[in-house]
Amino acid sequence: MTNTEPNAQGVPADAMRRLAELEPGKPGSIFTSDLSVNEFLLVREAGFKPIGLVLGSSIYHVGIQIGRWGKNQELETLSQAMYHARELAMTRMEAEAAALGADGIVGVRLTVEAREFGNDVAEFIAIGTAVKGDNPPPGGGSWRNNKGQPFTSDLSGQDFWTLIRAGYAPLGMVMGTCVYHIAHQKMGAVFSNLGKNVEIEQFTQALYDARELAMARMQAEAEALHAEGVVGVQLNAHNHRWGGHTTEFFSIGTAVRPLRADHEIERPTMVLSLDG
């Protein structure tokens, strides 16, 4: 009888067996990857070898929190649920990469998919390609981040190559989330604005506040990694199944650190073909 119990990070035993069968570094071993051909070649050119496709999953029941009809407010219970579910998926993906002895994970995709197990049930999935550096970073040390974990990055293979060539390295994906209830307008305000071009300040302030909260939380994660900055930031809004007045604002990007003082890359040169 096979053991199907997950390990301490929640990674299933079947996943650990799959990773063990890859045997990275041994003669005849294979790798798996969701990189395109161009991305794969550029990651190799940057000095990293793909060693395996890694993923993390969390099927999460998101609880209920009701916002006041006429008040702009963060729904902290829902914010915490969305953050924790994504964090579980990311942690399990990182655990798979660590089991392979990877230095990092590139091309990470983090998605949310509604499931039919219930109205408030969703699967949070993190997937990417684990890689290992051919050599230590310039100046020595490790490609892993200051927490000793494999770095994570949602940059494409092309952007990853450019980042490394320019003298930077990824530290980790950083994110911030805020689920916000946007107040309903009073009937008098609705009628007073009929036929007018006018800013609805109540809505403007709600969306502004929610995005700022998400951005601030992402920046705090980057500071915890001692990053110099965050690149490739995406700021998205998702209604999920909460209705039109409750929205999740989600900010995500890749925290980076410098590898050297010089951050210039070679300028492209023009090549004139002698073929007819």
Regions found by a protein language model. Name each.
Residues 85-139:
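Hydrophobic, ordered structural segments
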Residues 1-78, 121-203, 254-276:
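Intrinsic disorder/low-complexity detector
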Residues 89, 172-179, 214, 234-238:
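Short flexible/disordered coil segments
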Residues 54, 59, 68-109, 188-234:
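Short, well-ordered alpha-helical segments
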Residues 104-116, 229-242, 263-272:
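Short, conserved loop-to-beta-strand elements that form functional interface hotspots
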Residues 198-201, 220-229, 233-264:
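C-terminal functional regions that serve as terminal interaction/effector modules
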